[in-house]
Design a protein with these regions (language model features):
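Conserved C-terminal structural/oligomerization subdomain of aldehyde/semialdehyde dehydrogenase
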Residues: 6-10, 47, 54-169
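Short linear capping/connector segments at secondary-structure termini
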Residues: 15-20
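Helical element adjacent to the flavin cofactor pocket in flavoenzyme catalytic cores
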Residues: 34-39
């Protein structure tokens, strides 16, 4: 994981080589930084200095009760938690009121299918961290929201069907 984080390119979003731009605002950057207060930071990548709300990708070693393992960060921070087996990993993943998105990393396709069935998340990636595509549904579960944006189901969640009957006699 460390070599991938070190290689992650943070920079100008107009540059095609950039993999992540700055955060949206100073207040958002501050909120993401707040998740690192008292956290066991294992390692960080790099980010530009100067103008912009830059934030280096960060990996944190966490426990199940840690804030970073229980809340949505909305920033380039990965919380790594130890687990005993598949059932324990699923229990840990679901032990939060949130369920927007997650990732499963494994070489075992059967394990990926089993775990993905058990994790309560609106979007789930296998061996990837970026699974949002405009042609596929996107949305959360639990306190992360209801409904789906994008994809063929999107219109259903932004419209309300109404039947109007006209008598012609």
């Amino acid at each position: 994981l460390e070599p991938a984080v070190q290689a992650w390119r943070v920079g100008d979003p107009a540059d095609e080589a950039t993999e992540m731009g700055p955060l949206i605002s100073a207040s958002h950057r501050s909120a993401v930084e707040g998740f690192l207060d008292g956290a066991d930071v294992a390692f960080r990548g790099s980010a530009p200095s100067g103008d912009g709300f830059w934030f280096a990708p960060t990996v944190v070693l966490a426990g199940p009760a840690d804030r970073i393992a229980r809340e949505e960060v909305f920033g380039p921070v990965v919380a790594v938690l130890p687990f005993d087996d598949e059932a324990d990993a699923i229990r840990l993943a679901n032990d939060t009121v949130y369920g927007l998105a997650g990732s499963i990393w494994t070489e075992n396709l059967g394990r990926a299918v089993r775990v993905s069935r058990g994790v309560k998340s609106g979007v789930l990636s296998v061996n990837s961290h970026s699974s949002v595509r405009y042609w596929t549904p996107f949305g959360g579960m639990k306190a992360s929201g209801l409904g789906r944006e994008l994809g063929p189901d999107a219109a259903e969640h932004f419209t309300e069907t109404k039947n109007v009957f006209f008598a012609t006699d």
